Swiss-Prot record:
It holds the Pfam family Pterin_4a. CDD domains: PCD_DCoH_subfamily_a. It comes from the Bacteria. Keywords: Lyase. It comes from Vibrio cholerae serotype O1 (strain ATCC 39315 / El Tor Inaba N16961). It catalyses: (4aS,6R)-4a-hydroxy-L-erythro-5,6,7,8-tetrahydrobiopterin = (6R)-L-erythro-6,7-dihydrobiopterin + H2O. Its EC number is 4.2.1.96. This is Putative pterin-4-alpha-carbinolamine dehydratase. GO terms for biological process: tetrahydrobiopterin biosynthetic process.
Length: 109
């Protein structure tokens, strides 16, 4: 399971995933979308909560996860919603780390 793996160091010289690899890993996730923003492949998911306080608490859990994995997402916190977007800045695309962290986000809910 992806959520049981750890992220590995990803430098600018790392190789991003192929489209086929992205699709295979995406099939292991629930509710995540593969998007392209400014020509960069990213993973994105919106989580829904009953109120702002629950959404805020979840955002803090993601922040802790990001610190543990040394990999940082974009987090949009709104009333009752948290949108999480993962991609590897150093390679301007997707790495296995992004899928690992996406799975770990799901494990928090």
């Amino acid at each position: 399971m992806l959520d049981e793996l750890r992220c590995e160091a990803c430098s600018a010289g790392a190789i991003g995933l192929t489209s086929e690899e992205q699709q295979q890993l995406l099939s292991e996730l629930d509710g995540w979308a593969l998007i392209h923003r400014d020509g960069i492949a990213q993973l994105e998911k919106r989580y829904r909560f009953k109120n702002f306080k629950q959404a805020w608490a979840f955002s803090n859990q993601i922040a802790e996860l990001a610190e543990q994995e040394f990999h940082n997402p974009a987090i949009l916190l709104e009333w009752g919603n948290v949108t999480v977007t993962w991609w590897s800045h150093s390679i301007k695309g997707l790495h296995k780390n992004d899928f690992i962290c996406a799975a770990k986000c799901d494990a928090l809910t």
